């Protein structure tokens, strides 16, 4: 029932029927099949085949978690971390993540690494974060590969090693992880751990930008603005600044404001410039505050 539910939920090998998938998961879960309990929780969390119900999601995640199922433990932890269907409790999230991480669950290891890095729900421990990221990264988990790259880049929990940072960013970027793509672009832009190459930097920024990553959209806009790694194109600069600004990215709001103020790549509009500067300024952007 659980396997058939998987096929019906995804439409892989059978016509997609999410409602029927939920029925099958429910039957399997009530029959004691632990993976189906977690799958049913996911359906309730995402509203797949059933009305979204975060409390029911937590209920089924908990049932699978208490049976020792690592994905269920991880999903329950994330609910605690985000306050979805349950009161937010970072310490409870850590307890469940520890259980899943001990079973080698890469996602749990990576999220637990984030909490150790930030000291959320547990003591701040950069060395432990590095260890957890390494365990997850070696299993091919892109968020952990990116985080591990950053540890090597800045020397957090380990000795600084820019070359290793590039290696891990590249592994995550190859799996289309947007932040890793952007970070790899930064390495190429500034020659950190790799030979400086503005063209490659632009290529990586564009890959991340097309996946909606605001910092990369802003960086790509700046490259078009100044003709770095690409032919100068003020209109394209505005286009990319707009995309990042729409996501509330302060640097892009400020840069776009200047385009409107000066009429570069877009029709001059001082009122729009002021609005954008204010949006950036209210988020603490010193450039936005100064321009405003």
Predicted features by range, described:
Residues 6, 82, 94-97, 205, ...:
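Glycine- and small/polar-enriched repetitive beta-structure motifs of secreted/surface proteins
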Residues 284-292:
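Short, intrinsically disordered, charge-balanced linker/junction segments flanking boundaries
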